[in-house]
């Protein structure tokens, strides 16, 4: 089973939407979101709205999709602390590397927030990637400032020798000024391919998804 880690340029860049689009596109694929904050109680258990969306796609249990759940809608390390818990990055890494799902050929692992979001007082998603070496798919939320955020993310990945499979342009605003020019700029400056583009509220448009 191939595994990919889906991270983004920022919170609310559209990782969940794009991840679900990838699951729709590829047969025999599934998605999980191992860590989520901002969960609410439903039927005596904490539930995350993003995990519920993945469940609708996957028909997997929430326990498989989202084993680490916390209440407050803040950074995972703070939300876990408020719940009297802590996140062990080694356990998260082991879970994502060893999870086996029948008939699933591609597993998309959605992170919480961006690459440098703290999971505890020492570790970030970058440390998770150093442990797992799972290749990254970068979701770029197309908005003002995305070029800077994207190039900074690329630099961190490069310095730490983390493989990036490619990036996806997620068009958040149908009225964004010079949208195509921004995408062209990123294509020229990034060292990995544009895999796909999602137009505002629309389906994913394949550009280079066959490389996954």
From Swiss-Prot:
Name by which UniProt lists this protein: ATP-dependent dethiobiotin synthetase BioD
Main localisation: cytoplasm
Signal sequence range: none
One Gene Ontology term from the biological process aspect of the record: biotin biosynthetic process
Native source organism of the sequence: Legionella pneumophila (strain Paris)
Cofactor(s) required, per the database record: Mg(2+)
A Pfam family reported for this protein in Swiss-Prot or TrEMBL: AAA_26
Xref: InterPro entries: DTB_synth_BioD (IPR004472), P-loop_NTPase (IPR027417)
Stored HAMAP family: BioD (MF_00336)
Functional note: Catalyzes a mechanistically unusual reaction, the ATP-dependent insertion of CO2 between the N7 and N8 nitrogen atoms of 7,8-diaminopelargonic acid (DAPA, also called 7,8-diammoniononanoate) to form a ureido ring.
GO molecular function terms noted in the UniProt entry: ATP binding; dethiobiotin synthase activity; magnesium ion binding
Keyword terms, alphabetized: ATP-binding, Biotin biosynthesis, Cytoplasm, Ligase, Magnesium, Metal-binding, Nucleotide-binding
Pathway assigned in UniProt: Cofactor biosynthesis; biotin biosynthesis; biotin from 7,8-diaminononanoate: step 1/2
Location of this chain's protein in the cell: Cytoplasm
Residues annotated to bind Mg(2+): 16, 50, 110
EC number: 6.3.3.3
